[in-house]
Amino acid sequence: MERTFIMIKPDAIKRRLISRIIQRFEEKGLYLAASKCVIPKREVLETHYSHLSSMPFFSEMVEDMMSGMVLAMVWVGKDAVSIGRKLIGETNPQAASVGTIRGDYGVSTGKNIIHGSDCVENAEKEIKLWIGDDVQPVSFFDKEWIY
């Protein structure tokens, strides 16, 4: 089974959207394998978003992400990365389809509620960065029913 990294950002936590977001992943048949609530450190954010470091909004984004808790999660299931991306929607909530997390709850590109890995390789890097190596294997007792 494939793993993906999903992070609920401070704007969603401040708006009390955690349960609504988690419900969408569970309803799609993904399993929550690990989670961690943390106020992110600058170093972790700079590593996570290193591909955006030359962008003019980078410093403001890092400061905003440090403004409150994030919920870092590992979700497991068949095609977990692509399912996660479809559930999340476009980066810009204004362009995201209604029915996606960002389309329904996002306010702006800077307040877009959630992060999701874009490929399996990045998912594994992000899981290691945010959660570490302590993710236990998931028992799929209902695998045949879901898949």
Swiss-Prot record:
InterPro entries: NDK-like_dom, NDK-like_dom_sf, Nucleoside_diP_kinase. It catalyses: a 2'-deoxyribonucleoside 5'-diphosphate + ATP = a 2'-deoxyribonucleoside 5'-triphosphate + ADP; a ribonucleoside 5'-diphosphate + ATP = a ribonucleoside 5'-triphosphate + ADP. Its EC number is 2.7.4.6. GO terms for biological process: CTP biosynthetic process; GTP biosynthetic process; UTP biosynthetic process. The keyword Magnesium applies. It is an enzyme of class 2 (transferase). ATP binds at K9, R85, T91, R102, N112. Disulfide bonds: none annotated. Its cofactor is Mg(2+). Keywords: ATP-binding, Kinase, Magnesium, Metal-binding, Nucleotide metabolism, Nucleotide-binding, Transferase. It comes from the Eukaryota. GO terms for molecular function: ATP binding; metal ion binding; nucleoside diphosphate kinase activity. Gene3D superfamilies: Nucleoside diphosphate kinase-like domain. The active site is at H115 (pros-phosphohistidine intermediate). Belongs to the NDK family. PANTHER family: NUCLEOSIDE DIPHOSPHATE KINASE. Major role in the synthesis of nucleoside triphosphates other than ATP. The ATP gamma phosphate is transferred to the NDP beta phosphate via a ping-pong mechanism, using a phosphorylated active-site intermediate. This is Nucleoside diphosphate kinase. It comes from Encephalitozoon cuniculi (strain GB-M1).
